[in-house]
Amino acid sequence: MDKKLINRIFAILAFVVSFITYALTVQPSVPFWDCGEFSGATVWQQVPHPPGAPLFLMVAKLFHLFLPFGDPGWKINMTSVFADAFIILLVYLITYRIIENLMGKKVETTYEAISVYGSSLVAALAFNFSDTFWFNGVESEVYASSNLFVALIIYLMMRWNEEADNPGHEKYLLLIAYLIGLSTGVHLLSILTIFSLVYLVYFRKYQIKPVSF
């Protein structure tokens, strides 16, 4: 069986299982706490508590406008459902790359493909069913969308690490910088990835010396 096909099947499976899980358990209307504020701010495109979340409100507004059925609160909650489903897909992609790095080689045989990709799927689904992650994936809060930016940045960091010796590798760093800036329109959490990015670039491209550090 083709290794790329196995990889794609498992990746799609991770996304589908996550999406179905959260779609079946999403809050049917407006949840408690800040969710009500974000739901109201989304519908009327107003400003929630500082520092605000303009990008989240605009994306959630699209769900409110274009989902043809359901309670307005439910529509906005679906923003987090889609965000968390894509996070689980990225967790799968990140995990199998970590395993390949530990192996010191790419997957070569069908047996290795099933072992590596299957293990990555288990890891992704374990994260999918964890309590805190699940809790944030079924309500109109910014955390799911913020975590999506973090997961995407980590994935791009791994892609850059793979391509760091090839021409054009800077495009990954530029995209990461853009996403970090964009993510501040959702939550400030993604700024923490800057420290990991700096360490990655340093250890990948420079000799480890007290002066250079």
What are these regions (language model features)?
Residues 1-21, 86, 108-121, 211-213:
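Start-transfer (signal-anchor) and selected internal transmembrane alpha helices
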Residues 42-74, 78-82, 89:
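Short hydrophobic/aromatic helix or loop-helix immediately within or flanking a transmembrane segment
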Residues 69-77, 102-113, 120-147, 180-190:
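Aromatic- and kink-enriched transmembrane "portal" helix at the membrane-lumen/periplasm boundary
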Residues 12, 78-108, 152-156:
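Transmembrane-helix motifs of polytopic, lipid-linked glycan transferases
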Residues 188-201:
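Transmembrane-embedded, aromatic-rich helix segments that form part
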Residues 8-9, 91-129, 164-171:
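Transmembrane-helix signature of polytopic, membrane-embedded enzymes
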Residues 41-44, 124, 172-185:
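Membrane-interface alpha helices of multi-pass inner-membrane proteins
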